[in-house]
Amino acid sequence: MRIQNTLCALLLLTLVGCAAPKQSLYQWGDYENQVYSLYNDPGKSPVEAQIEKLEADYQKARSTNKAVPPGFHAHLGYLYFQAGKGDQAVQSFQTEKALFPESAIYMDRILDKTKK
C-alpha cells in the first residue's frame, strides 16, 4: 500500500511538473529593469537610450498582441519630458490614462504640471 501511494504521488508530481507555465497578461520586456535602474542608479544610461529600449519593447508588445504593463506609458512619458519632448510626453500620459482609468487622477495632475 505504501509503495502504491508513493508511486501515485510521484506520478502526480510528474504531471504537475509538466504543466505549461502560465502566460503573462503583459509584455514586460525590459520595463522593470529600466525602472529599477532609473531609481537605483540615476544617470547611468542616457534618457534617449532608455526611450529607445522602451519604444522597442512597445513595438514587440504590439507585434505579439500583448498589452504593456501599467505605468509603462507614464514612465515613457516621463522620459520624453526629461528629453524635452513635451508633446510626446503628453500623448504618453494620455495613453496611460486611457488604458488604465484607475490612474486618471494621477495622470491629470501630471498633465496639469506639464502645461505650466
Regions found by a protein language model. Give the residues of each.
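Structural register within alpha-helical repeat arrays
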Residues: H75-L76
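C-terminal motif of bacterial Sec signal peptides marking the signal peptidase cleavage site
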Residues: T14-G17
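Residue signature of alpha-solenoid helical repeat architecture, marking inter-repeat boundaries
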Residues: L25-W28, A67
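Bacterial signal peptide processing site
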Residues: A19-K22
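TPR/TPR-like alpha-solenoid helical repeat scaffolds
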Residues: Y36, N40, A104-K116
